[in-house]
């Protein structure tokens, strides 16, 4: 069995709301954001700071639901400052043969300046004759179908 590591969840362009160097390691994230993409408390995540290029590996602690909180703790707090923009993602080990046979789906939360959902995507690997095809599909907000599609067309996203 050959295993591969695939991204299964990503919080894209979230804004740092606080940084606590004296707190014991980790990153504290609004539990609603974690639930939306399927990242579990204590799950290992990788983080890149888009403001300075710093990268690190840590684990997640759940923060207050609905707060928009993204707070690197411990040593990671020295790699960023309030209002920096981060990409946070979690990977999972997958059996390569199963991915080629059944595909794979990752959830992507794209944040606005307040860490609310600006866009939500599924990035999908669809099986195709021993290989996979990659697709990135926006989830259309309920009741916004024509407005949302028009916006996507105008911004050249579809």
UniProtKB/Swiss-Prot annotation:
Binds 1 pyruvoyl group covalently per subunit. Transmembrane segments: none annotated. The modification Pyruvic acid (Ser) is found at residue 26. Its EC number is 4.1.1.11. GO terms for molecular function: aspartate 1-decarboxylase activity. GO terms for biological process: alanine biosynthetic process; pantothenate biosynthetic process. GO terms for cellular component: cytosol. Its cofactor is pyruvate. Substrate binds at residues 58, 74-76. Keywords: Autocatalytic cleavage, Cytoplasm, Decarboxylase, Lyase, Pantothenate biosynthesis, Pyruvate, Schiff base, Zymogen. It is found in: Cytoplasm. It is an enzyme of class 4 (lyase). Pathway: Cofactor biosynthesis; (R)-pantothenate biosynthesis; beta-alanine from L-aspartate: step 1/1. It catalyses: L-aspartate + H(+) = beta-alanine + CO2. It comes from the Bacteria. Is synthesized initially as an inactive proenzyme, which is activated by self-cleavage at a specific serine bond to produce a beta-subunit with a hydroxyl group at its C-terminus and an alpha-subunit with a pyruvoyl group at its N-terminus. The active site is at residues 26, 59. Belongs to the PanD family. Heterooctamer of four alpha and four beta subunits. PANTHER family: ASPARTATE 1-DECARBOXYLASE (PTHR21012:SF0). Catalyzes the pyruvoyl-dependent decarboxylation of aspartate to produce beta-alanine. This is Aspartate 1-decarboxylase. It comes from Trichodesmium erythraeum (strain IMS101).
């Amino acid at each position: 069995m050959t295993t591969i590591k695939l991204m299964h969840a990503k919080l894209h362009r979230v804004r740092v709301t606080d940084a606590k160097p004296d707190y014991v390691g980790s990153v504290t994230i609004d539990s609603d954001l974690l639930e939306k993409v399927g990242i579990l408390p204590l799950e290992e995540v990788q983080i890149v700071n888009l403001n300075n290029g710093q990268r690190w590996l840590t684990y997640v602690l759940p923060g207050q639901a609905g707060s928009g909180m993204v707070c690197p703790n411990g040593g990671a707090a020295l790699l960023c400052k309030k209002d920096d923009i981060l990409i946070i993602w979690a990977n999972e080990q997958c059996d390569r043969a199963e991915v080629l046979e059944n595909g794979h789906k990752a959830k992507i939360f794209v944040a606005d300046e307040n860490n609310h959902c600006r866009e939500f995507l599924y990035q999908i690997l669809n099986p195709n004759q021993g290989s996979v095809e990659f697709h990135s599909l926006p989830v259309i907000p309920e009741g916004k179908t024509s407005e949302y599609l028009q916006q996507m067309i105008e911004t050249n996203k579809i």
